[in-house]
Curated annotation (Swiss-Prot):
GO MF: glucuronate isomerase activity
HAMAP family the UniProt entry points to: UxaC
Enzyme superclass (EC): isomerase
Gene name for this UniProt entry: uxaC
Keyword Isomerase: yes
Alphabetical list of Pfam families matching this protein: UxaC
Keyword Transmembrane helix: no
Name of protein: Uronate isomerase
Annotated source species: Xanthomonas campestris pv. campestris (strain B100)
This protein's pathway: Carbohydrate metabolism; pentose and glucuronate interconversion
InterPro entries for this protein: Metal_Hydrolase, Uronate_isomerase
Amino acid sequence: MPTPLILHDDRLLPADPATRAIARRLYAQTAALPIISPHGHTDPAWFATDAPFANATELLLVPDHYVFRMLYSQGIDLDQLGIPHADGSRAPVDPREAWRVFASQFALLRGTPSALWLNHVFHQVFDLRIRLDAGSADHYYDHITAALQTPAFRPRALFERFNIEVIATTESPLDTLEHHATIRDSGWSGRVLTAYRPDAVVDPEHEQFASALQQFGALTGEDVMQWPGYLRAHRQRRAFFAAAGATSTDHGHPSAATADLSPAEAQRLFDTVVRGQATPAQAELFRAQVLTEMAAMSVDDGLVMQLHPGCFRNHNRALFERYGRDKGADIPMRTDYVHALKPLLDRFGNDPRFRLIVFTLDETSYSRELAPLAGHYPALLLGPAWWFHDAPEGMWRFREQTLASAGFYNTVGFNDDTRAFLSIPARHDVARRVDSAFLAKLVAEHRLDEDEAMEVAIDLAYRLPKQAYKL
């Protein structure tokens, strides 16, 4: 007999009845607010073409490395799940069979945020009322895949149903942004922006750096083998992105290191980099210098700068060689911010024209470094609990460890940072519930009045991300 799938109305709210009652009232004021999704990795082609999603596997399993990394950890080969290889090929696996494998292992996700999000998607988006397991796999696959062929489940219809006010995707400087142009020219009212992510032409250790740099020069007409031309190329592409609606840039570096070299020093370093002779230390220094140059450009063009450092990318070499990037083998690292950011903050930390949103995968830095920095420098804001820490527990720890030094208003609310489009409402719902629970505790302890908590809850869910990202 199938087991019912139930979403409890009080999920993630406090167990204490009095505090829970406060949290319910706070959550009621934020639950239906529009979604501001200022940073993420959805595919703009979805909204440009508005083509139906293919099937349950292609939509909910293949793009979601949160999910398939857990299955891989338990010995499930990624070929069994239909995950594409680095060269674009795939093992000849039937999507239904891949879904059956996933369904048979769904219990591995118990207690994880992925289970929270997926059960929300199953229940709220697809009206499924039994749990996913081996016995219900085909029912789920058929029900979801059939729904995806209907007009109500086209990307634009879902965007509107989810009450998304604005969503930002993330593109390389080499992207033509043709999908964003198609969206703008279509007459559709949905607001889909881009963000400038230049990692492939900034990181000498990126496997595509040499070829990307050549394309960068060809695209811009600049001599990107010389430092001044390289910087002009960035300015040109940033202006192109801004004209297409971008309000932010994003930088995914191994560390938070910044530097402030003289033009002559930067040119000498750049010469070494473009010859392919940079040592790891020189590659790190180059990334550090480019971050400071990006900050200088943000002062001029007004784009908000995001920094997502501290991840050892592609830790599993064999997996990377077979499947490429973003396949669940990225591991958090210890990250320094106090010393690393100082060269950049010395130049721009007090400049009212500059805004830097910093994220971390190193929770030990919250109260020791990041909250004190954000609680001092006018230009610096804290991004929300990110990636390995966007579980309810991680969101709670973020608030506990940053509130004393940074308050609420040196943070930027929530962003979902996901490729999994259908999980966006679930992720924002979890954040709103956790913040309601956290604020309810402060009210119950008489640290906030309820009207103050109500205002903060709305600010965190809606106003702060709009303000921080200039939306």
